[in-house]
């Protein structure tokens, strides 16, 4: 960089040793090396920026030249190829739009079919359950309650132990339960 030979470098070192002394010479060398690194990095940054600007300028000039030539001055074969590409792009776009519309309609149809199938299966399952299990409609009459109590239905055999944990169960409600048991 500075075109300094070995003998000149030794001479600078000896002068620096005499002027600065052995204690300050290493600090001075580090400082000078830091300056040299900074100058080198600045020079490379400026060089890179200039080369990028030149490339950008060349690209802009070539774009201007291409615009000046215009598409009308292209060869007839190239113009035909460009037109064919445009037509094929339009055909592909139309095909994609048609396929998208078909897909959307088929998806909507499938959703409607699934909804109706679910509704039908729910209705069928409810009627199947009602057929298989004879559910009494409405409320039970007192006679039917008594009949179920004699058969030993677990829901009708509730005693005081079932209500003992309830804090609001009072003595009158316990008596009412016992009265119902006696009647049934």
Swiss-Prot record:
UniProt key word Transport: yes
Compartment(s) of residence: Cell inner membrane
Gene3D superfamilies associated with the record: 1.20.5.3310
UniProt xrefs under SUPFAM superfamilies: Apolipoprotein
GO CC terms: TAT protein transport complex
Residue span of region Disordered: 149-184
Annotated keywords: Cell inner membrane, Cell membrane, Membrane, Protein transport, Translocation, Transmembrane, Transmembrane helix, Transport
GO molecular function, one term: protein transmembrane transporter activity
Domain of life where this protein originates: Bacteria
Membrane topology label: Single-pass membrane protein
Keyword Metal-binding: no
Acidic residues: bias regions: 149-168
GO biological process: protein transport by the Tat complex
Annotated TM spans: 1-21
Record-stated family: Belongs to the TatB family.
NCBIfam families in alphabetical order: tatB (TIGR01410)
Its biological purpose: Part of the twin-arginine translocation (Tat) system that transports large folded proteins containing a characteristic twin-arginine motif in their signal peptide across membranes. Together with TatC, TatB is part of a receptor directly interacting with Tat signal peptides. TatB may form an oligomeric binding site that transiently accommodates folded Tat precursor proteins before their translocation.
Summary of subunit composition and partner proteins: The Tat system comprises two distinct complexes: a TatABC complex, containing multiple copies of TatA, TatB and TatC subunits, and a separate TatA complex, containing only TatA subunits. Substrates initially bind to the TatABC complex, which probably triggers association of the separate TatA complex to form the active translocon.
Protein name, as recorded: Sec-independent protein translocase protein TatB
Gene: tatB
